[in-house]
């Protein structure tokens, strides 16, 4: 009698491994397992007959003859890794597991070797297929061996068509249950369903304030809004929330659009909150007439204390007529009386949620607006403006970082009070990094205090700052998308994002040589060129497409002093890209004499040295490293960041580099062999050399430029 495998198409982790195992069995022993699909979020992911536990191993055990091609202990090890580690949504842990799998697949076609896949491959492939975070990782070849192996198995119809089988079965199930009128399903890496989202009707928005440069937190918000708009075949609005003329500049607005363009984000519309100043003014008048808002001239500090203590303002019961006069005549015209007042929403001054304690919704500001000039003397606050403009522009889903969660009730109250349509809110966690400030106010303070050069300083978490440090657009985008719309608030290490970047730059970064504190070595022997000799060598040994570079060979060379200090007389060392030499003498001035031994075995030498010919062709360079701007991983609410400033955050090292750097242009990324990755930031000028910024490589010992 055949067994029955029941797969839950709506399980948080779809049982692809079990499904594929059953398809393998049926391919070799037809009709051995009947495959049934259910559409029930509460049902187990998989069930074999009546068993809901350890279903994959039950299938492979029952049909052991089919899956008997691998060491049982090894199979169990990889099945365990698949079921416990490859399905998790924590990027840091998932990345470690993928690296383990990638290492195992090095020089192997399948996980356990051999010419055919085993149960280990089925379990791991199925786990990756079910994990939404893995889609972009595999597509972008973050782990090369894993991507190659995954693609190979995907070409097998038993694997590759598993998703189509699942989708078609689910569709048939829905048709038979007469639920075809529900929203169309969509492929989503983030495994969430937006409430009341309808295919083709979803509208999201990214609303940056033009008061600073785009930082990584903004990049996540922008990419998530773009993702869901595209996933539901909807629209994305890029809206500048320009309601505070004291902070905003057209310069910031232009830079935000440029950075979004670099990230591949283009809105279907670009709008401005200032486009709706008249509408928001009218809505405020409506609220006052409805008795839902009042003008208040209570001094700022006293108002703050009253809100904290749940005390009603003395102005809370002003008449509608008095409130209208102050708002439409005094505040609107910026008179002396108007400047003393603000408008507050009349919600609940005793509310447990303190954001509902009569928040301010309009203020006077005489600073000319960068778009509307001096037309307006009053401006809506963020909390009043956003729900109104969202409703006017047709936004269906407002994605906001989780620190706004307490304000969600306020957002909904504004829409209800003004009788505007409902907009759904979806919270997600902002990206936080250790020893990093994302507050625009704090970043501006550092700019004003000359602690950094500007908003594009390589120590800043702005998109421009990290790009100047050497972050690629592809690396940044892949990292942000890998985080998904998680609501878990965590402080990430910078090595995570730089590890993504390394995957992008390592295969294509030309290899160059830089020498610090050069020590001379004179080479003896007939093989040592008496005159400088140039040969063309590949810039990247593993990627000929990167091109060629000039390497000068000569009897006199220089090496790093750190290298010279650890090698001894009579020791054989390897000069990279040349051959072995035997040190025959160390002079009092530190220089050395060596004899070429090009027939020597480089595998037997302890030290492999980078070197340059000691000629006039060497190029002076400045290698710049950076540390974090603050010394503490995470600041508490009562701690001031000024008390935790890192004393020194910029470090310069003089060096000489090979002549090929003269062909570089600003922004080029290279690797100085045995030193790391670098981005060219400045060309020689006014006697200053080429300036290269270090690019962190993702190792925990070198967190975002922190000195070792």
Curated annotation (Swiss-Prot):
Q: What is this protein called in UniProt?
A: Glutamate--tRNA ligase, cytoplasmic
Q: What else is known?
A: Present with 48700 molecules/cell in log phase SD medium.
Looking up HAMAP family in the UniProt record yields: Glu_tRNA_synth_type2
Family the entry assigns: Belongs to the class-I aminoacyl-tRNA synthetase family. Glutamate--tRNA ligase type 2 subfamily.
Sequence intervals crossing the membrane: none
Which reaction(s) are listed as its catalytic activity?
Answer: tRNA(Glu) + L-glutamate + ATP = L-glutamyl-tRNA(Glu) + AMP + diphosphate
Entry's InterPro entries?
aa-tRNA-synth_I_CS, Gln/Glu-tRNA_Ligase, Glu-tRNA-synth_arc/euk, Glu/Gln-tRNA-synth, Glu/Gln-tRNA-synth_Ib_cat-dom, Glu/Gln-tRNA-synth_Ib_codon-bd, Glu_tRNA_lig_a-bdl, Glutathione-S-Trfase_C_sf
Q: What is its EC number?
A: 6.1.1.17
